[in-house]
Amino acid sequence: IQIRLVGSEMCIRDRSNMLMGPEFPWYFLPDKVTKGDGNYQFCHNFILSGKVVSKFVTILDPFIKKLNMKRVIRIKANKTFKKSSNIESKMHIDVTRKEDEKFKTAVFYCNTNNGATLFESGKRVESKENRAVIFDGKTLHCGVDCTDSHRRVVINFNYIDE
């Protein structure tokens, strides 16, 4: 698990501001991880199963280049809202791949809040603007809702870099 800044602060802030702005389209999902979990979120899919599904995908070009993505499996943004406690979603992996296929997951934090990404090992990575956590795509992890900001916005990247 590695944590790093992703790029030029101004470049990244412009893109994050677009996602945080009122013109960006978000879609309601009644379940965050599994059907019936009751932990809703809003989502915007950019790439699904390697196919572009959003006209906004070009805002991600600097991330794709910086993270040296050779093949993108999926990219989506998640938006959750302030809760009364730091609720953890169910541990999961983002995408299912062949047993021997190596891929990475990166979670980019668009805003700073007391939410986090939690790993099965117990490691916790706080949501800090302009930072990403990168890890083996088969690592169990979960999102933790925030209590100190109106919203928590992240971009999830699943990709192959070899």
Features from the language model and the residues they span:
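Residue-level detector of short, conserved catalytic/binding motifs and their immediate flanks
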Residues: 75, 104, 131, 153
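Signature of the catalytic double-stranded beta-helix
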Residues: 18-23, 34-91
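A short beta-strand-loop-beta hairpin characteristic of the jelly-roll/cupin
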Residues: 86-91, 101-103, 109-128
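Conserved metal-binding segment of the jelly-roll/cupin
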Residues: 122-142
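Short beta-strand His + acidic residue motifs that chelate non-heme Fe in jelly-roll/DSBH
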Residues: 90-91, 140-148
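A short, well-structured alpha-helix characteristic of acyl/acetyltransferase catalytic modules
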Residues: 13-29
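Single conserved hydrophobic/aromatic residue that forms the stacking wall/gate
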Residues: 1-12
